Amino acid sequence: MNRMMLFLILSIVVISGADALPKFATRQGAKCQSCHINPTGKGMRSTFGSTYGREELTMTTYKETTDIEEYSPMLNDFFTVGMDYRTLFYYREQNSTSSFFQMQGDLYLDLRLNKKFRIYFDKGLYSGFEVFGLAKVLPLEGYIKLGNFIPSYGLKMDDHNLLIRSGAFFPINPAIASYPGGLGFGQGAEDTGLELGFSPAFLTINVGVFNGKKGGLAGTGGTKNKAIVVRADANVQTDLVNFNVGGSVYNQPNAGSPGKTQIFGGFGVISLNNNLTLQGEYDYLTTYNSVLNKEVTGSILYGELNYLLTSGVDLKLGYEFYDPNLDRKDGSISRFTVGAEIFPLTGVEVRPLYRINQEKPTELNNNELHIMFHFYL
C-alpha cells in the first residue's frame, strides 16, 4: 500500500508542477475508438489514428523529403489494410546473451459490409488471431462486437512485457515461478465472446461475456460459467490538462481449468501541455494456486512518465511492482524502465529501453536492454 501512496503522490506532484497508446489519445483529448477500428483500442488505425501517426508523431527532419503525398491504406471505400511489424534486439545481463526476436508481424483487414457493419481480421506470425463482426447500431454511440478478441481490461498497452499485460518474456524471479507472470491480457489472450460498448458524452463503457478460455478450437468446450469483463472510463479535456480515469473488472468463476480468476483495478492517464504524460494502473489479481492448493491474491502496480522532448522523440521513465501473494512473503518483483520512443520517419519507430529488475528475497543480476524496431501502416 505504501507503493500505491507513492504513486498517488507522484501524480499530484506532476499535476501541480508540470508545464494509443493511451498517452497519445489523452494528449489529443480523444478516446481509443477515435484512433483504432477496434472500439477498445489496439490493432488497425482509423483514419484519425493514421493521420495522427503521420502528421504528429514523426520527426520533421526528413518528413518533407520522404513522405508520400496523399497516402492512404484504403484500397477503396469499403476495404482497408494495415500492419504492425516489430523486431526486438535484446541483451540479458544474467547470462550475457543477446538475440534478435521477431515479436510481431500482424496483418489487419477491415471490410465494410454497409454503413453500420464491418468485419475485422488480425492475424499475426504465431498462434492467436482476432476476428470479429462490429455493428454500430446501439444508442449512445454504442456497438455490438462478436467474435474472437482480447477482452477489454485496463490500459491497453502495446508492450506485452509489462506486468499489467502478459508479463516479462523471460521469468524474472524464480521464487514466484508458481504464480501468474502478469495479468494475462497480452498477445495470445484472445477469447471468444460478445461485447457491448457505449460512449455517451465523455464516458465509455464496455461489457463483455466470454468463454473464459483461449480462443480457437481449444476454447470451444462448453462450460456452465462464463467470464464477465466490465470496463468504464471518463475522458475530460481542458485548455491545460487532459485526463482519463477509469476501472476494470474481470471475473472468471470456472472452478476447473484454468481455475478461478478475478481481477479488478483502476487506471488513469493525465497529460499536461500536450507533452508531459503520466499513466498508471493498479490491480488486484486472485487465482487458484495449484502448488499451495488454494486461492491467492496479489497486486500489480504500473506507472510511466513520458515527456515529448521534440517532435518524434518521447522520453520514458517507468516503474512496476508485483507481489503475487499478499498473505505470504514468497517474493516480489520491482522493475524500473528508462528509454525513449523515437519516430525518425513516417511509419518507423525505434524504442530503446533499459530495464532494471529487482527481486526479493534473492537479488539477481538480470537487467535487460531492449531495442525494438517497429514499422507500421
Segments from the language model and where they lie:
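Detector for outer-membrane/organellar transmembrane beta-barrel domains
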Residues: 223-225, 233-325
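The canonical Cys-X-X-Cys-His
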Residues: 29-39
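Outer-membrane beta-barrel proteins
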Residues: 66-72, 113-115, 137-139, 200-202, ...
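Outer-membrane beta-barrel architecture
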Residues: 106-108, 132-134, 195-197, 231-233, ...
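Gram-negative outer-membrane beta-barrel proteins
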Residues: 43, 89-95, 129, 152-156, ...
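Outer membrane beta-barrel
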Residues: 43-44, 75-91, 95-215, 224-229, ...
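Outer-membrane beta-barrel "beta-signal"
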Residues: 31, 342-343, 365-377
